[in-house]
A protein has these predicted regions:
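Beta-propeller domains
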Residues: 1-236
Length: 236
């Protein structure tokens, strides 16, 4: 899904398991578990973020056998230094995370995994539009985890985010629901994807959100040197 250079190593990433270590010539060395830190059943997200100030890698994982989501922080030398557990009794589709100043933001949409349906060969994803989406702001350096709620929506990818005047500002690609219904004739999805900007007030817990533009887009990115910081340009 993605490629990462961090701590003097080159990784190929996917969110279903351990990363693969590669050579500079892109030959596969094998699975990498950070010298035993990752256990069987662990994984790393395919879209981790690197703090431009400290060089730390911020990533995450979900396990089927644990009722929580784990945020992992790995220092610039590639050594795991902190794990933060976030209660999450239902397994949701969480594909990305975003660094916002001293916080890490996770979208927890009402798009849930149903392992029993998956084992029977049925559609394993449940969409519950009557359930609010939850936005989770996790302090990287300790402190209370903050929870926010908005009407249901779905998102695969962030663009960037930052902290300003007691608020977290997050730019991301918004969708109305999980996008697994396709038009069989054209191959195009039936719903649009637009850039949105969400603002979380850390004091009042108020959430505001607005569409940035009407352009259909995906795979939003920004200059990684400004990850988690105020920025001017994004690409999608």
């Amino acid at each position: 899904t993605s490629v990462l250079q961090h701590g003097g190593k080159l990784y190929s990433l996917w969110e279903g398991g351990f990363p693969h270590l590669m050579t500079s010539g892109l030959d596969t060395v094998g699975l990498y578990n950070y010298d035993g830190y990752l256990k069987p059943g662990d994984a790393l997200t395919a879209h981790p973020k690197v703090c431009p100030d400290t060089g730390a890698l911020i990533t995450c994982t979900q396990r089927w056998d644990q009722p929580y989501f784990t945020l992992q922080i790995i220092d610039k030398q590639g050594k795991p230094v902190r794990a933060i557990e976030v209660p999450m009794p239902r397994k949701a589709i969480i594909h990305d995370l975003q660094l916002c100043g001293d916080y890490v933001v996770i979208f927890y949409p009402p798009a849930y995994h149903d392992i029993n349906k998956a084992l029977k060969g049925e559609d394993p994803f449940l969409w519950e539009p009557e359930t609010p989406a939850k936005i989770i702001a996790i302090p990287r350096n300790g402190g209370d985890i903050l929870w926010f709620e908005t009407p249901a929506f779905f998102s695969w990818h962030f663009c960037n985010g930052f902290e300003r005047d007691g608020k977290l500002i997050i730019d991301y690609v918004w969708m109305e629901k999980i996008p697994f219904a396709k038009n069989m004739n054209s191959g195009l999805e039936k719903q649009t994807r637009n850039m949105h900007r969400m603002t979380l007030d850390l004091k009042t817990k108020a959430v505001t959100d607005h569409k940035v533009g009407d352009i259909y887009c995906e795979f939003s990115r920004s200059d990684e040197r400004l990850c988690g910081k105020p920025y001017k340009y994004g690409f999608a």
